[in-house]
Curated annotation (Swiss-Prot):
GO terms for cellular component: membrane. Its EC number is 2.4.1.182. This is Lipid-A-disaccharide synthase. It is an enzyme of class 2 (transferase). Condensation of UDP-2,3-diacylglucosamine and 2,3-diacylglucosamine-1-phosphate to form lipid A disaccharide, a precursor of lipid A, a phosphorylated glycolipid that anchors the lipopolysaccharide to the outer membrane of the cell. Residues 221-604 are annotated as: Lipid-A-disaccharide synthase. One of its GO terms (biological process) is lipid A biosynthetic process. GO terms for molecular function: lipid-A-disaccharide synthase activity; phospholipid binding. It holds the Pfam family LpxB. Residues 1-220 are annotated as: Unknown.
Amino acid sequence: MIPSGLVYLLYPLGFLASLFFGSAFSIQWWLSKKRKEVYAPRSFWILSSIGATLMIVHGTIQSQFPVTVLHVINLIIYLRNLNITSSRPISFRATLVLMALSVVFVTLPFLYVNMEWMASPNIFHLPLPPAQLSWHLIGCLGLAIFSGRFLIQWFYIESNNTKDFPLLFWKIGLLGGLLALVYFIRIGDPINILCYGCGLFPSIANLRLFYKEQRSTPYLDTHCFLSAGEASGDILGGKLIQSIKSLYPNIRFWGVGGPAMRQEGLQPILNMEEFQVSGFAEVLGSLFRLYRNYRKILKTILKHKPATLIFIDFPDFHLLLIKKLRKHGYRGKIIHYVCPSIWAWRPKRKRILEQHLDMLLLILPFEEGLFKNTSLETVYLGHPLVEEISDYKEQASWKEKFLNSDRPIVAAFPGSRRGDISRNLRIQVQAFLNSSLSQTHQFVVSSSSAKYDEIIEDTLKAEGCQHSQIIPMNFRYELMRSCDCALAKCGTIVLETALNQTPTIVMCRLRPFDTFLAKYIFKILLPAYSLPNIIMNSVIFPEFIGGKKDFHPEEIATALDLLNQHGSKEKQKEDCRKLCKVMTTGQIASEEFLKRIFDTLPAV
């Protein structure tokens, strides 16, 4: 493809390109060290562009297609970094099109002739046997990884609007550079040995600078990072911020939260709503988004170093994050609010809690016993619902507003999400209609959101449930206190019915996939699944939980008829009163545990 005489230009061109690349990284490293942070000056991109242009010519002369095409891609990225801060930056799409056209333009000459993918000039006639295919694959992989670091940097600048380098850039550069160096030593290419050998030093130097900066940055005593991934955690977080502010008004709160936490002054880096998924299938479908959010939280904490981290519930996500933070050297105080259900499944998580936490805040009375023989500090705060429900004042006119019948009430709480309602409400309606109560009672459904009212109405109509009404979630406590009994989907709502002393039957229809995983993979087989039964270690409420083969509406209908007997209802109410007493015994006041956190911050 190129006249053979030009092969003697290889070394001067390659050496000159290496000088430009070396100068670019030397300037970048010197300025970064001066500024005490990883930094990419404009001169870096100019010098790198010149070096890439020379390497494109070098690769073309040497018939090295991978070298040529990867430097073409990198050249476009260098130019994009120069362009993004100009007065007239081109769009991401235009950059992508330009890159694709450049790759096609460079590839065509190589396709036209019978070229070698990774030819070696061997001007010095070194006694090296021909490299096997496996060596060429290693070389191509190393070059792809080494050049791929700029694709990562390009994605970083497009999403963050900054020309700086992410940590992953230097890690990828070090790995790819090592593979490429080993390959070029094998084929005896002195210019690329020089180029990629020297190219390791910027990665090592910048990684050293990054970790040195991370270790030397002081922790911010007045900063508290909080994270909640679910609505229940958001409510806990909002009340916690309220308590902290009353004692420590100078604390700044930021992190991940929902409306309750934001209302109390949390400055969000992400909104809680981005994490709301339920069931194994939904989690699998949201893995990329969850991982992206995980990386953002991790990097933000390590960069700003708040002295206190409080993670609220959402254990699978938060425990992964906590482990990674400790691995990266975070030495501030880490608190987890709400103990993961280690008593139900995956007990090995207890070890993670003991190794990485400074304090665990508990909301269930029996959980303190799980950590009796460990060094982990635990604090039993009690469940926030106990105080909330005991202080709740009913709205007297709610029946006139929502009900058009004086019949006694059977209440239904099918769940808070669309999938929960679709699976559970139909069974609840069928159970009611198959019981004797359908002749004497009305069926009232608590709706978690107005957007689900249509689904509820369609289900009631399809099942022919005539004496039925829908009321908003805000009036659920009024409904619990006024109904004869309730059908409730297993979850927090069951604890609410218990604390309101509402006779209840617990049920939950699982998806087939969730049923399979729960039974055969994770083997979650417990004597009880609802919190009142677990806390009291006895059957307060009957439970119907599982897939289609595990229970039928007729069985729930029979349980409804049994519950309607006066003695059964009074027995449940008495057990609920005992539950309230158990849950209020041994609680620590908020002022006491907050002083343990903020008055004893570690010297970091």
